[in-house]
Amino acid sequence: MTEWTPTERRRLRIGIAILALTPAFVGIWASITPRGFYDDFPGGGRTWVSAVSVYDEHLVRDVGALYLGSLVVLAFAYVYLERRLVQAALVSYAVAALPHLVYHLTALDNLSTGDSVAQITGLALNVVLPLGLLATTTRGGSERWRESMDRSAPGRSPASPTG
């Protein structure tokens, strides 16, 4: 059931597609060539991963697989745009992105100023964008959403919001 206006649907789909770029890029690269990912991420002569940690093929492959799992959830959210699925995808993305950002805020010593700014900006966007999109899922149509919650929540009925 679609509960958003066409503008909200478009905004959500664009935002989810942008979010999906990171897990697609990281997930595919780290899964297929873990050593290349470690040595060369994010590309263009930059070496953000190898600058802050030792190589561990198992860990890099696991990170790649986890990013691919996140990509699958985002893809389902993009295709179906079901409120709870979209909210779960966005919250889980932000939950993973926040400690990642916090760690990298404390591990900037081996990076140039430009790389530090680029890295932290990208990581911060991975926290802020899903939270901003999450706000879209509770605005506009929020009355319809509340009504659907009343109808679908266990032990609740539309006539009795407290059950």
Where are these regions (language model features)?
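Juxtamembrane helix-break-helix junctions at the cytosolic face
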Residues: T5, L71-V91
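Membrane-water interface at the C-terminal end of transmembrane alpha helices
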Residues: N126-E147
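Non-cytosolic membrane-interface motifs at loop->transmembrane helix junctions
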Residues: L111-A124
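Hydrophobic alpha-helical membrane segments
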Residues: A88-H104, A124-L129
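Short, highly charged, low-complexity non-transmembrane loops/tails of multi-pass membrane proteins
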Residues: W145-G163
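Cytosolic juxtamembrane helix and N-cap/initiation of the first transmembrane helix
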Residues: M1-V26
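Hydrophobic transmembrane helix segments
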Residues: L21-L59, G64
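Core segments of alpha-helical transmembrane spans in multipass integral membrane proteins
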Residues: S53-Y78, V95
